[in-house]
Curated annotation (Swiss-Prot):
Family classification: Belongs to the cytochrome b family.
Role, per record: Component of the ubiquinol-cytochrome c reductase complex (complex III or cytochrome b-c1 complex) that is part of the mitochondrial respiratory chain. The b-c1 complex mediates electron transfer from ubiquinol to cytochrome c. Contributes to the generation of a proton gradient across the mitochondrial membrane that is then used for ATP synthesis.
Subunit structure: The cytochrome bc1 complex contains 11 subunits: 3 respiratory subunits (MT-CYB, CYC1 and UQCRFS1), 2 core proteins (UQCRC1 and UQCRC2) and 6 low-molecular weight proteins (UQCRH/QCR6, UQCRB/QCR7, UQCRQ/QCR8, UQCR10/QCR9, UQCR11/QCR10 and a cleavage product of UQCRFS1). This cytochrome bc1 complex then forms a dimer.
Name of the protein in question: Cytochrome b
InterPro entries: Cyt_b/b6_C, Cyt_b/b6_C_sf, Cyt_b/b6_N, Cytb/b6-like_sf, Cytochrome_b, Cytochrome_b_C_euk/bac, Cytochrome_b_N_euk/bac, Di-haem_cyt_TM
Species, as recorded: Cynocephalus volans
Source species, domain of life: Eukaryota
Amino acid sequence: MTNTRKSHPLLKILNHSFIDLPTPSNISMWWNFGSLLGICLMLQIMTGLLLAMHYTADTTTAFSSIAHICRDVNYGWIIRHAHANGASMFFICLFIHVGRNLYYGSFTYSKTWNTGIILLLTTMATAFMGYILPWGQMSFWGATVITNLLSAIPYIGTNMVEWIWGGFSVDKATLTRFFALHFILPFVISALAIVHLLFLHETGSNNPSGIPSNSDKIPFHPYYTIKDILGVLLLMTILLTLTLFSPDLLGDPDNYTPTNPLSTPPYIKPEWYFLFAYTILCSVPNKLGGVLALIMSILVLALIPALRMSKQRSMMFQPMSQCLFWALASDLLTLTWIGSQPMEYPLTLIGQTASLPHFSIILILMPLANFIENKLLKW
């Protein structure tokens, strides 16, 4: 008699995706981050649902409803901070996941890669709208500055901004629609994640060596379920440590001040995980140019498969490409640091200098390194 998980119409899908899935035997800990992102998404949906039960999307009561959650709701403080810091853990896993796919050449799975880019953009939009909901000073001014960037679009820009705002400034209509979208988008992300997995399981997973592993595969369960549990425990340890000992470490103190449209904070900045793109935006003196640079700082990922010239898939045996990869990683850290500082000399100059390698490494130096490495290996 066939096992139920192999014959039941619903369990069969789960079985082929998480239990009997043929997986390369040599994948490293860097392959853990896909499952960690799934855990983060579930955690965010659960904590977000509990917060939404007590939150009011109204400009007069939004800030006090957050205070009510932290003070009066049973364990409301831990739910609120787990949700806020959970977003930070989500983006840490997300950036490492993208970096791993870059390093090991998994972007050659174009369908999986492109759905991943859409997932990244959707997650960034969701996180941005979540940052607006506490309705503190940085929420209000962050919403005003970032949405106002659309006004750089010729002809339709101003109309688009007013359409998003639901009026002539960021107000109640803006907060209400951002809350509605912030609530629904995680479910869209869940659907996109299923599509992402569907495309991945069409081709099978890549591995560190970058060569086909069809002759050496093992079932996902129990080997990689056990391995993933270790990653989950480490993630939860870091998240709980952050939430319980230093919940506001990654937040902004200005967001503990209720919104005042008549008082601008000294330096308006988004959450830390957007700072690299924000620095690139601020580094271009022209408004439209800055907006295009901001968009391209993410969309440049979509060009990587087309620019790849290497005959090898993984960077494991490509020292020049490895140096460029780590230069790109350190450049992103520099951009993040500059974004957190007030825009004044010499920080603006460092930001402009660091913005250039972000594009030049991906668009020029990586393909050039691939070409040189091919020649050195006489390919």
